[in-house]
């Protein structure tokens, strides 16, 4: 069976068991291909994380492909129909961990760049790749550290295309031009442990906190806007008690998360939470963790280039969206870069038997190449 360039490179990358944060030579494979077409290769290792910054050209504007080589753990191997790191094609679908998220997109980016450079060896500006093995994990030694390094030497990205699987029903139907912010908190409410038969000698933190938690759940934080849905508050964990039926717990721990729009700031959310907790007279401690700021790329050069390319290749009028979880775009957007996420279908990401339609790989490559044409062709 003859494989296209993109499928062949995808198969090579999918054979690497690059469970986060292990890269397992994926970046070496990519770097060797890019070096052959004139990219300057700069590996950046921080802690146990491999990162790659590759650039062709020294002038602006800079178009950057961004993505990650790490994948999530496979889960139970006996639940897979085939070895997750021995990719297989069955019924027109390519199976393997990372097939959708996001090794096939990385392959498409490399092949698209090779083809564009062959046609336009003297293209304007620069083409760059920012690849990490720390997107699926803590994301502390990956893209964020590369961006910090680039910022220190005043190396700016103009446009950034992240190859996350953005499509929903067919290739290119959705592109992400922003993401909501993510704010996490661990709330500890102090009570006084005691016997359930003597509640007057104890203070039940579950009872005391319940009205405050109910108010937090019912609060309308904002109404969203044209690009973002309303801010969402979700409690993910509650823990209290010793396991005994006759003991009033001495403390309650609640974990919750905000996915928030550009209508509010993290500081405003924190302030309102404290106001509600204080109003209910709770004795508490709260630890906040901001895991991502919201970002938005309005319609402009990058969005137009992507929409035009998708329409030309697939005939699809794409829809802009900010739904879904966080991505590494949150580290790149604050530099002033226009950021867009565009990749294959996301229906099976992180699942057993993750797969992608083989017939989407070459059109995705064509879309990426046309975006380069639209922005950097002389």
Swiss-Prot record:
The keyword Zinc applies. This is Succinyl-diaminopimelate desuccinylase. Signal peptide: none annotated. It is an enzyme of class 3 (hydrolase). The active site is at residues 70, 135. Binds 2 Zn(2+) or Co(2+) ions per subunit. Pathway: Amino-acid biosynthesis; L-lysine biosynthesis via DAP pathway; LL-2,6-diaminopimelate from (S)-tetrahydrodipicolinate (succinylase route): step 3/3. SUPFAM superfamilies: Bacterial exopeptidase dimerisation domain, Zn-dependent exopeptidases. Zn(2+) 2 binds at residues 101, 136, 350. Belongs to the peptidase M20A family. DapE subfamily. Keywords: Amino-acid biosynthesis, Cobalt, Diaminopimelate biosynthesis, Hydrolase, Lysine biosynthesis, Metal-binding, Zinc. Its cofactor is Zn(2+); Co(2+). Homodimer. Gene3D superfamilies: Zn peptidases. The keyword Amino-acid biosynthesis applies. InterPro entries: Bact_exopeptidase_dim_dom (IPR036264), DapE_proteobac (IPR005941), Peptidase_M20 (IPR002933), Peptidase_M20_dimer (IPR011650), Peptidase_M20A (IPR050072).
């Amino acid at each position: 069976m003859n494989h296209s360039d993109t499928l062949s490179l995808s198969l090579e990358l999918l054979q690497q068991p690059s469970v986060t944060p292990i890269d397992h030579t994926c970046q070496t494979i990519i770097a060797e291909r890019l070096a052959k077409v004139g990219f300057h290769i700069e590996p950046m290792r921080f802690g146990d994380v491999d990162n790659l910054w590759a650039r062709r050209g020294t002038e602006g504007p800079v178009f950057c492909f961004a993505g990650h080589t790490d994948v999530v753990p496979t889960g139970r191997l006996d639940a897979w129909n085939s070895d997750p790191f021995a990719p297989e094609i069955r019924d027109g679908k390519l199976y393997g961990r990372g097939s959708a998220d996001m090794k096939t997109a990385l392959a498409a980016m490399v092949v698209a760049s090779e083809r564009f450079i062959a046609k336009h060896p003297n293209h304007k500006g620069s083409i760059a790749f920012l690849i990490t093995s720390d997107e699926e994990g803590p994301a502390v030694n990956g893209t964020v550290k590369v961006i910090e390094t680039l910022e220190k030497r005043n190396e700016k990205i103009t446009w950034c295309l992240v190859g996350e699987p953005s499509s929903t029903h067919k290739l290119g139907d959705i592109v992400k031009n922003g993401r909501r912010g993510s704010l996490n908190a661990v709330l500890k409410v102090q009570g006084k442990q005691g016997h359930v038969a003597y509640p007057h000698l104890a203070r039940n933190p579950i009872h005391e906190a319940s009205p405050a938690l109910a108010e937090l759940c019912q609060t309308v934080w904002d109404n969203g806007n044209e690009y973002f849905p309303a801010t969402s508050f979700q409690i993910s964990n509650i823990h209290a008690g010793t396991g005994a039926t006759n003991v009033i717990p001495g403390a309650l721990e609640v974990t919750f998360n905000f996915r928030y729009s550009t209508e509010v700031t993290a500081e405003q959310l924190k302030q309102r939470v404290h106001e509600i907790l204080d109003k209910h007279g709770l004795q508490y401690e709260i630890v906040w963790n901001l895991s991502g700021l919201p970002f938005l790329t309005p319609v402009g050069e990058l969005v137009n280039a992507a929409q035009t390319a998708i329409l030309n290749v697939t005939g699809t009028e794409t829809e802009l969206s900010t739904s879904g979880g966080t991505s590494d775009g949150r580290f790149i957007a604050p530099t002033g870069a226009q950021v867009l996420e565009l990749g294959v279908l996301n229906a099976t990401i992180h699942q057993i038997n993750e797969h992608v339609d083989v017939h989407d790989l070459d059109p995705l490559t064509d879309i990426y190449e046309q975006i380069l044409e639209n922005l950097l062709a002389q």
